[in-house]
Amino acid sequence: MKFSEQWLRGWVSPQVSRDELVARLSMAGLEVDSVTPAAGDFSGVVVGEVLSTEQHPDADKLRVCQVSNGSETFQVVCGAPNVRPGLKVPFAMIGAQLPGDFKIKKAKLRGVESNGMLCSQAELQIGEGNDGLMELPVDAPVGEDVRTYLSLDDASIEVDLTPNRGDCLSLAGMAREVGALYAAKVQRPEVPAIPAAHDEVRPVEVLAPAACPRYLGRVVRNVDLSKPTPLWMVERLRRADVRSIDAAVDITNYVMLELGQPLHAFDLAEINGGIRVRMAEEGEKLVLLDGQEVTLRSDTLVIADHTRALAIAGVMGGEHSGVTANTRDVFLESAFFDQIAVAGKARSYGLHTDASHRYERGVDWQLAREAMERATGLLLEITGGDAGPIIETLSEQHLPSVAPVTLRAERITQMLGMEIDGLEVERLLTALGLTVTADGAGQWRVEVPSHRFDISLEVDLIEELARLYGYNRLPVRYPQARLAPQAKAEAEGDLPALRRLLVARGYQEAITYSFIDPKLFELFNPGVEPLLLANPISADMAVMRSSLWPGLVKALQHNLNRQQDRVRMFESGLRFVGQLEGLKQQPMLAGVVCGSRLPEGWAQGRDGVDFFDVKADVEAVLGFAGALDAFTFVPGKHPALHPGQTARIERDGREVGFLGAIHPELAKNLGLDRPVYVFELVLSEVAQGRLPKFHELSRFPEVRRDLALLADRDVAASSVLDVIRENAGEWLTDLRLFDVYQGKGIDPHRKSLAVGLTWQHPSRTLNDDEVNSTTQNILTSLEQRLNATLRK
């Protein structure tokens, strides 16, 4: 919500500075996002009148003007296309200071003397108009300072409202809050009822009363929309970031900003018969005011006449029924549309309007008539015309209602950590428009007004008290409770410790969205039906992720595009597998790695990370809870991974994750020009460990044997190690694969595996005969089962 400070102070004016007001609003939960001046920093600019113009003798696009400041006449050379006799414009006289530290001096343009400058909006930083001079009203007093005339010593305050505070999406709502914060009186403008000057009405039929419980319409005849919108209204709209269009549209926008009630003006000549508020027919077409043609769905509420749809209710009007400069009769609409009926409709059609923004957050249903009278009065004042009677339809059973809320003093003390005097409680709540009745026993019965849709519980009232009293004034009271640590199996690992482990291995934690682009989902999961969101934030966040990889890879792209060549990230979060029926939400731990193996340094190379580097990180995670030997890595297939660099991770035969390099085709589609490795693990399987078994350290020496084995190239090293373990006996304490070789001196169909075996007995020294016998058993089993022999 953006508004002019001067406009706000016209409603309520606490005796505080702008800075204090802004700080107080933010502390009350209405966070001020920005404060911007209404105009640039300039001085010496007055209202000037162009008395005459003539062509510059040496320049086709320049004109020599005689300009009056009310007491003197000055010659000014100007190249603006709209300069003409009788025009009143901002006139920067000699010595004037313009934004950008630009000082006006006497000058010669193509040999003709110029004593000042006629200014555009952009040159004074009053809006963005740079296509000509800023035209002031014909009644602007010549010679008056422009800053004074336009009240430019003002600022636009932008408040970032939370979705539950739709009541503050208007100047009336903001004034109500400021009045409550400072115990200041709010001067709400009187809105008199406009008497009917004729009896013409258009019948209104509401066919969807649950979606539109209240609808008001009024015919206003003989308006002149060629008349300009008054400068004071244009300026208030500009300072609220609303562009002036024409008198009718400006008035409806102004009333919406002022009171919070969206309105719409139809060209009466384009309405066939009466008004029907109905649900759209499936496939019905409508060209909107922005020129976009939309195909309506049957769940969309529309305003229609007897032949076609005229507008999407609460979102945007249609082009063919919109008002133009030629419109002579208008039909004003002021309605209350249910939040649920409007919610998400604008986004579903790729739209976002001020009206939909308000209806989605809630509009006070009691505002409709006041807003209609206010808009009618302004329309008659600015454009002339004759107003007819208001026609209204009302479905009371579908209007929102809030039951009274009981507030207890005891509960206030409990939640805020302090007591608030009963009279102060009543004063604060009454200032917000709530009706408070005390029962004399430390309780109040509070009736909630129709504009506060966010108050329905006792805690909501206590929140209001805390806001108005001041969060910074609440005492610091530490909670006192008997807390018992949560019981947890000793063998179970915890996520924070796993995070610390990965950070220690050079990873950084990432947090990505659970909803992703459908195209990205298809790239990682071709042929899989995604879980679609009914009301997505945007089109590229429309499906739930079935893996953490898409978000991590997108984060990787973001970093690579910013010259971060070495990226190691992990994330823990939920993945969503299946559809709504039988949906599985599974906690996962995933990572992405790209770049060099080690950080840049003089003592280490710049070798790129490879599959086995990432596998080592995964093994560290799997072994964290003491159960590494329960996991196995087997060759696997995954549509997102390289067919030759993919490992499926299993635990007791169950699939618990994947590790591998991004598939080359996927990398190409994602614009990745370097190897990228990813892993993803089921968190519950990783965390499930084993209790360590402690035993006395042996005082006797270890015995080590290194074996160089020749095996077929397609034999997995893990198979060789499994056979060795089975035959190495109970005193084997360590088994390591420390070299793999293929090349000169080796059969091209074979490979050499070098393994180290270590034995140690807890109570005696092992002799060579025992170790040699065991080694021979190992070699015999390897040859029989895997055709693996000792290299000679």
Swiss-Prot record:
Pfam assignment, any one: tRNA_synthFbeta
Ranges for domain B5: 400-476
Presence of the UniProt keyword Nucleotide-binding in the record: yes
Domain of life: Bacteria
Residues bound to Mg(2+): D454, D460, E463, E464
SMART domains: B3_4 (SM00873), B5 (SM00874), FDX-ACB (SM00896)
Domain FDX-ACB: 698-791
GO BP terms, alphabetized: phenylalanyl-tRNA aminoacylation
SUPFAM superfamilies: Anticodon-binding domain of PheRS, Class II aaRS and biotin synthetases, Nucleic acid-binding proteins, PheT/TilS domain, Putative DNA-binding domain
Cofactor annotation remark: Binds 2 magnesium ions per tetramer.
UniProt GO MF annotations: ATP binding; magnesium ion binding; phenylalanine-tRNA ligase activity; tRNA binding
Any one cellular-component term (Gene Ontology): phenylalanine-tRNA ligase complex
Catalysed reactions, semicolon-separated: tRNA(Phe) + L-phenylalanine + ATP = L-phenylalanyl-tRNA(Phe) + AMP + diphosphate + H(+)
Keyword Iron part of the UniProt annotation: no
PANTHER family given in the database record: PHENYLALANINE--TRNA LIGASE BETA SUBUNIT (PTHR10947:SF0), PHENYLALANYL-TRNA SYNTHETASE BETA CHAIN AND LEUCINE-RICH REPEAT-CONTAINING PROTEIN 47 (PTHR10947)
Complexes and interactors: Tetramer of two alpha and two beta subunits.
Name of this chain's protein: Phenylalanine--tRNA ligase beta subunit
Lineage, highest ranks first: Bacteria, Pseudomonadati, Pseudomonadota, Gammaproteobacteria, Pseudomonadales
